[in-house]
UniProtKB/Swiss-Prot annotation:
Residues 65-82, 105-116, 123-135, 162-178 have a biased composition (Basic and acidic residues). This is Translation initiation factor IF-2. The gene is infB. Residues 299-303 are annotated as: G2. Residues 136-145 have a biased composition (Basic residues). Residues 374-377 are annotated as: G4. One of the essential components for the initiation of protein synthesis. Protects formylmethionyl-tRNA from spontaneous hydrolysis and promotes its binding to the 30S ribosomal subunits. Also involved in the hydrolysis of GTP during the formation of the 70S ribosomal complex. It is found in: Cytoplasm. Residues 52-178 are annotated as: Disordered. HAMAP family: IF_2_B (MF_00100_B). Belongs to the TRAFAC class translation factor GTPase superfamily. Classic translation factor GTPase family. IF-2 subfamily.
Length: 763
């Protein structure tokens, strides 16, 4: 028998790698990781241990089944005894029914005593016979009432006394036999829903609420205490539905395990991780022969991208994750859906903090790691130093006696890229990656954003099943029918199988990045699942917001001079919100607390300024700009709005402001805004925009931001400014003219051009 790795033996024994490694340690077999190899003697020793364990479990299961058979026999005996006693009691009841008493009063007493006997019977017997006994009682009672009225016509006093006695017994019987209705409701419910639940008209319910001093319309939500109080006025009991902490997989049971015979081979999903600027996107550029890095601000990947390539007629899916520590959550999501992790380390820089973090993410996900040592073409490259630092962090190279695959590469020259791809396919083949394509799809949302023209969009990675055009899906509280799907090259596709990244359209709102996405049978099922999650999230938000406000209030009282820095975040994509949030909250210290009071996708609007004014907050925009109305309102309300294109600048500014070191050298002055009415292509010059100046002025030496739906598209200097055929230094409000942007031609009618200058401020 040849040597095999730990994780391969775990698959053969049908146990988890973690469990196998613990058993190896118990048997004094030393292994470093799941990639370690075992010899023939060690394999035989482990297999014999698990065979003994299986025999013990089998004997225990047999003994348990014998005990259960005995219990079933005893239960059957008890049921037979209960049936016999039930027959006897029925006979006794029938004999009582045939007996006609001489005096009505005695008959009343027997009816009541008969009810008391039934009341104290076993609960199971009560449930079977309650309706029959009630009918008998009512029948006996009516006969008694008739006899009372006929026998006592000549005696008025006797009649009154006996009728009063009868009424008391009638009320007692009704009180004991009639139980109030019970309903289960959510912790919060609208007045309309409550009226339908307890079968009371809306007008009656609103009137009763007004009597209790509560003014509410039919669409207004009331809490459980209020609902319980008003329901009690209608002799109805309501109970609160317990909202449990749940995971999508546990509650919906949609991500079930497939049968082995249904599984088919699927492409591997590769996550590229590493420290910022170590060359992750550049390596993907070389592999895909595209220029993604050139389009990112500062050459840094801002959002997760998913790409499919072909190598030797086999597909490989790459996830490109940002390297900065602000994107911890995004990298963690990438590790959860990946099969092989590529750790990029610069040969001239070595292991950095985010490199260690990426190692931990990959180890926690239990995926094999391939180290790509990049930038080996540089003069100060030191591969041996990188190997030493990797070994110190638990990744021992193969040529040093370890099990970590190291591939020296150069993204600039292309050296070693083919070797890296071969190693990826080799490791993926050892993993035996399979999935069932013939089932409803299950996947993960990699990124999501709101597009003005197409609505909510989501980049997803299908993990199981096949996602098809027109499928009903839900992800978190978002749901809808897929109207269109696009692959990573922008081409429309009709279906996507396992390990396929696609951009989908058709959801009713933007899902959360990292959420699972499920395909279901019909629209009703998708809406129900999404609504259930929405209700759960709303309850959690109500709880957290009320608790947070109280903590904030008491915190200020106890801390005395504690200051809070409230921040509102607006970004162009949803995944960036969490990244900025985590980074800014970490900046809190003993003197200043950073509170993120709101975060959303889209441009900065007047509602954001109103919220900032009410909560004394500053607004931070990332790749977005405020509307003109929002800018004017912020100026009047003295609200600070800061916009950024690179996340590090935002973090550094807030950090410096907290520590009191922020001394701005330049202050931005917005000169004016112009709207693009038409565009013209001029040979040798490029695209020239015909603009109309709405506010302020546009000058020749100004820097211009091109905004499309308040999203920042381009920022750069003005290349030309004309009025008719003449070059001018400025265009003022109410005038039209032509404007060209330096090295940028993708201008469209309806775009807004915002001109500004930076004025030096004395320190």
């Amino acid at each position: 028998m040849e040597k095999i790795r730990v994780y391969e033996l775990a698959k053969q024994l049908n146990v988890s790698t973690k469990d196998l490694m613990s058993k190896l340690k118990d048997n004094k077999i030393e292994v470093k990781s799941h990639m370690s190899t075992l010899d023939k003697d060690q394999i035989a020793k482990v297999k014999s241990f698990y065979e003994k364990q299986k025999k013990v479990q089998t004997s225990q299961n047999n003994s348990k089944s014998n005990d259960e058979n005995k219990k079933i026999t005893n239960k059957n005996t008890e049921k037979t005894t209960e049936k016999i006693s039930t027959v006897d009691s029925n006979k006794q009841n029938n004999s009582n029914k045939r007996f006609k008493p001489k005096h009505p009063r005695n008959n009343d007493e027997e009816s009541v005593s008969h009810f008391d006997k039934i009341k104290h019977k076993n609960k199971s017997e009560m449930n079977e016979k309650r309706d029959l006994n009630d009918k008998k009682k009512n029948k006996n009672f009516k006969n008694t009432k008739n006899k009372n009225s006929n026998n006592n016509k000549n005696s008025k006093n006797n009649k009154n006394n006996k009728n009063n006695d009868h009424n008391r017994k009638d009320e007692a019987i009704k009180h004991e036999t009639k139980e109030p209705k019970k309903f289960i409701i959510q912790p919060t419910i609208t007045v309309k829903d409550l009226s339908e639940k307890i079968s009371v008209s809306i007008s009656e319910l609103i009137m009763k609420l007004m009597e209790l001093g509560i003014m509410a319309n039919q669409n207004q939500e009331i809490d459980f205490d209020t609902a319980s109080l008003v329901a009690g006025e209608f002799d109805v009991i309501v109970e609160q539905d317990e909202v449990e902490d749940f995971d999508d997989d546990d509650v919906f049971n949609l991500d079930f395990e497939d049968k082995k015979e249904d599984l088919k081979e699927r492409p591997p999903v590769i996550t590229v991780m590493g420290h910022v600027d170590h060359g992750k996107t550049s390596i993907l550029d070389r592999i895909r022969n595209s220029r993604v890095a050139g389009r990112e601000a500062g050459g840094i990947t801002q959002h997760i991208g998913a790409y499919t390539i072909r190598v030797n007629d086999k597909k490989i899916v790459f996830l490109d994750t940002p390297g900065h520590e602000a994107f911890t959550a995004m990298r963690s999501r990438g590790a959860q859906v990946t099969d092989v992790s590529i750790l990029v380390v610069a040969a001239d820089d070595g292991v950095m903090p985010q490199t260690i973090e990426a190692i931990n993410h990959s180890k926690a996900a239990g995926v094999p790691i391939i180290v790509a040592i990049n930038k080996i073409d540089k003069e100060n490259a030191n591969i041996e130093r990188v190997k030493t630092e990797l070994a110190e962090n638990g990744l021992v190279p193969e040529d040093w006696g370890g099990d970590t695959v190291l591939v020296p590469v150069s993204a600039r020259t292309g050296e070693g890229i083919d070797d890296l791809l071969e190693m990826i396919l080799m490791v993926a083949e050892m993993e035996e990656l399979k999935a069932n394509p013939n089932r409803l799809a299950v996947g993960t949302v990699i990124e999501a954003q709101l597009d003005k023209g197409r609505g909510p969009t989501a980049t997803i990675l299908v993990q199981k099943g096949t996602l098809k055009h027109s499928d009903m899906v839900f992800s978190g509280q978002a749901s809808g029918r897929i109207r269109a799907m696009f692959n990573d090259q922008g081409k429309q596709v009709k279906k996507a199988g396992p390990s396929t990244p696609v951009l989908i359209l058709g959801l009713n709102e933007v899902p959360e990045a990292g959420d699972m996405i499920y395909a279901v049978k019909d629209e009703k099922e998708a809406r129900n699942y999404a609504q259930k999650i929405k209700d759960h999230n709303r309850e959690e938000q109500i709880k957290s917001s009320s608790t947070m406000n109280l903590d904030e209030l008491f915190g200020k009282i106890s801390d005395g001079e504690t200051k809070d820095l409230n921040i509102i975040i607006k970004t162009d994509v949803k995944g960036t919100i969490d990244a900025i949030k985590q980074s800014l909250i970490k900046l809190s210290n003993e003197e200043v607390k950073v509170n993120i009071i709101h975060g959303a996708v889209g441009g900065i609007t007047e509602s954001d300024v109103n919220l900032a004014s009410a909560s004394s907050a500053i607004i931070i925009g990332f790749n977005v700009r405020p509307t003109q109305v929002a800018m004017d309102m912020a100026k009047n309300e003295s609200i600070e709005i800061r916009t950024y294109r690179v996340i590090y600048d935002a973090i550094e500014d807030v950090k410096n402001a907290i520590t009191g070191m922020l001394k701005p050298q330049y202050q931005e002055e917005v000169l004016g805004r112009a709207t693009v009415r038409d565009t013209f292509k001029v040979p040798g010059v490029g695209t020239v925009a015909g603009v109309y100046v709405n506010t302020g002025k546009v000058t020749r030496n100004a820097t211009v931001r091109l905004l499309r739906d308040e999203i920042l598209i381009f920022e750069g200097p003005v290349s030309s400014l004309k009025r008719y055929k003449d070059d001018v230094k400025e265009l003022t409000q109410g005038y039209e003219g032509g404007m060209g942007l330096e090295n940028y031609n993708d201008i469209k009618p309806g775009d807004v051009l915002e001109a500004y200058v930076l004025n030096e401020v004395q320190r």
